[in-house]
């Protein structure tokens, strides 16, 4: 049954060319929202926009001027902006090898009862550029999006924002200091913004997905994926549809009493 409780609402979703973002776009469109699809890849943005009968707005979320212009264009065109989902992100690709090294060391430790793991060199070899890019895409991108949208929502005195963090923002992992730091920052930022905007009728929440079956997991080896699944209580990766249902709940009237909250969906990974 098609629930039309989002009928007439306008949603802006970053990183929606594939994976979680595309699932969010489809789910909100299913319930009547008009979706503006952002992605760094113009073709990916246009593909999702075509599927959900929305419009594409391709740009790099680390470009604050581009973000401001995009939100201004949406408001000028529709006269409102109801929903922002800050989803754009990049995987800790550069640390996939050190993730595997950490797992290998843990296995060695269990097998030989070694009391100390060998030191990891991922942090000392992490470049300024890799650190900066990770922080800028996740944390700066979320800030730029919220700042631009809140200028509109402040005038409207309504709106909902969902910032996508990660379980690694709650429980940091070896080999992902830059990713964990960025995602933890999103959690703190979300709580602060929610406190500032609640009196305006604006709700701001964060979602911390666990390991979800998306292209972001492509860099991980079979060894890494096997180790991850063994730690998930449910015994499998999550699906984009499961996270999309949670996000749909948070942008709708069903969650009208929720703001400043962090919702974890990890299958029991960090229980």
Regions found by a protein language model. Give the residues of each.
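Short, small/polar-rich loop/turn modules that mediate ligand/substrate recognition or access, typified
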Residues: 198, 203, 233, 258-260
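Residue(s) in the substrate-gating loop at a strand-loop-helix junction
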Residues: 166
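Active-site helix of classical SDR
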Residues: 146, 182, 190
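Catalytic Tyr-X3-Lys loop
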Residues: 90, 101-143, 158, 162, ...
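The beta1-alpha1 cofactor-binding region of Rossmann-like NAD(H)/NADP(H)-dependent oxidoreductases
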Residues: 42-43, 58-71, 90, 128, ...
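Canonical Rossmann dinucleotide-binding motif of NAD(H)/NADP(H)-dependent dehydrogenases/reductases
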Residues: 4-36, 193
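C-terminal substrate-recognition "lid" of short-chain dehydrogenase/reductases
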Residues: 158, 236-270
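Alpha-helical segment proximal to the catalytic Tyr-Lys
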Residues: 151, 195-196, 256
């Amino acid at each position: 049954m098609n629930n039309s409780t989002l009928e007439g609402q306008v949603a802006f979703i970053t990183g929606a060319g594939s994976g979680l973002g595309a699932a969010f776009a489809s789910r909100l469109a299913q319930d009547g929202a008009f979706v503006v699809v952002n992605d760094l890849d113009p073709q990916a943005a246009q593909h999702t926009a075509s599927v959900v009968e929305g419009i594409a707005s391709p740009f790099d979320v680390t470009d604050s001027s581009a973000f401001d212009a995009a939100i201004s264009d949406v408001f000028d065109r529709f006269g409102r902006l109801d929903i922002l989902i800050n989803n754009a992100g990049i995987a800790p690709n550069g640390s996939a090898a050190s993730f595997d090294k950490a797992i290998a060391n843990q296995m060695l430790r269990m097998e030989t009862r070694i009391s100390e793991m060998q030191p990891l060199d991922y942090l000392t070899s992490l470049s300024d550029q890799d650190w900066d890019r990770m922080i800028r895409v996740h944390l700066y991108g979320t800030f730029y999006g919220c700042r631009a949208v809140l200028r509109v929502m402040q005038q409207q005195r309504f709106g909902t924002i969902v910032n996508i963090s990660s379980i690694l923002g709650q429980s940091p992992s070896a080999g992902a200091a830059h990713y964990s730091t960025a995602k933890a920052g999103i959690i703190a930022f979300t709580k602060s913004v929610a406190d500032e905007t609640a009196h305006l009728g604006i709700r701001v929440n964060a979602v911390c997905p666990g390991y979800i079956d998306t292209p972001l997991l492509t860099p991980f080896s079979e060894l890494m994926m096997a180790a991850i699944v063994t730690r998930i209580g449910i015994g499998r990766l999550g699906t984009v549809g499961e996270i999309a249902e949670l996000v749909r709940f948070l942008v709708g009237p069903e969650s009208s009493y929720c703001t400043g909250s962090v919702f974890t969906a990890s299958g029991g990974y960090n229980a």
